[in-house]
UniProtKB/Swiss-Prot annotation:
Transmembrane segments: none annotated. It is a peripheral membrane protein. Its main location: membrane. Keywords: ER-Golgi transport, Membrane, Protein transport, Repeat, TPR repeat, Transport. GO terms for biological process: intracellular protein transport; vesicle-mediated transport. SUPFAM superfamilies: TPR-like (SSF48452). This is Alpha-soluble NSF attachment protein 2.
Length: 289
């Protein structure tokens, strides 16, 4: 590992010498770029991620000065991979620079891909507001490029984290829109009942029985096959338990559904929120009697 570090530093010094010396304008930067790439690779072999990231940033600068924009964007993306191991904020900043160049040269699919990656950095750091913002940008770019599946994946992430942040209306709109658009697609229509279920659960979190009742009617009009599903019955039974303010019934309905279709952590979190509201309402009424 020490040998790799020594080699990396030697390559970097040679690159600096090239950049500071005389030479034909274009070839000077091209020669330095070759050396910086070798330096970055050696730093990676030495697992010196911060130094590798810095070398890639210098490499990107060389490519920009020789007007190799695509290569510069790729160097920023490589820098991000290195910084990801030590500093996700710096990694996101590098990818943002890559995205700006890809937008400039019309590589919008690459821009979308890297916006999604930035979102995932923030997601792994549990910075959900920032993750939402970048998943939204990625979804918009994927949609413009007509990569519908990727756009849907990003929008579903937006809805998931919006609901976690109690932005229920935003989440509901996304789930309902995706359900609506999926109905006419043979590959996607089987996911419709799942999207309607998650939208319905966001309605439940608002603790508004009228809202969930109206939503259920709308969903059955939208997709007549939803009526006979376990998901539709589950939402209707939960709405009934909420209307009756019956915590025991609510718990039984959840247990029964979970025994047939295991609930993931997001759904469990949403249902716990609804249950807590029911408990709070029960305590409030006890205090009044």
């Amino acid at each position: 590992m020490g040998d790799h570090l020594v080699r990396a530093e030697e390559f970097e010094k040679k690159a600096e010498k090239k950049l500071n010396g005389w030479g034909i304008f274009g070839s000077k930067y091209e020669d330095a770029a070759d050396l910086l790439e070798k330096a970055a690779n050696s730093y990676k072999l030495a697992k010196s991620w911060d130094q590798a990231g810095k070398a890639y940033l210098k490499l990107a600068d060389c490519h920009l000065k020789s007007d190799s924009k695509h290569d510069a964007a790729n160097a920023y993306a490589e820098a991000a991979k290195c910084y990801k191991k030590v500093d996700t904020n710096e990694a996101a900043s590098c990818l943002e620079r890559a995205v700006n160049i890809f937008c400039e040269i019309g590589r919008l699919n690459m821009a979308a891909r890297y916006y999604k990656e930035i979102a995932e950095y923030y997601e792994s750091d549990q910075k959900f507001e920032q993750a939402i913002a970048y998943f939204e940008k990625a979804a918009e770019f994927f949609q413009n490029e007509e990569v519908t599946t990727s756009a849907n994946q990003c929008n579903l992430k937006v809805a998931q984290y919006a609901a976690q942040l109690e932005q229920y209306e935003k989440a509901i709109k996304i789930y309902e829109d995706i359900a609506r658009h999926s109905l006419n697609n043979n590959l996607l229509k089987y996911g419709v009942k799942g999207h309607l279920l998650t939208a319905g659960m966001c309605h439940l979190c608002k603790a508004d029985v009228v809202s969930i009742t109206n939503a259920l009617e709308k969903y059955q009009d939208l997709d007549p096959t939803f009526t006979g599903t376990r998901e539709c019955k589950f939402l209707a039974d939960l709405a009934s338990a909420i209307d009756e303010e019956d915590i025991a019934k609510f718990t039984d309905v959840v247990k029964e559904f979970d025994s047939m279709t295991p609930l993931d952590s997001w759904k469990t979190t949403m249902l716990l929120r609804v249950k807590e509201k029911l408990k709070a309402k029960e305590l409030e009424e006890d205090d009044l009697t």
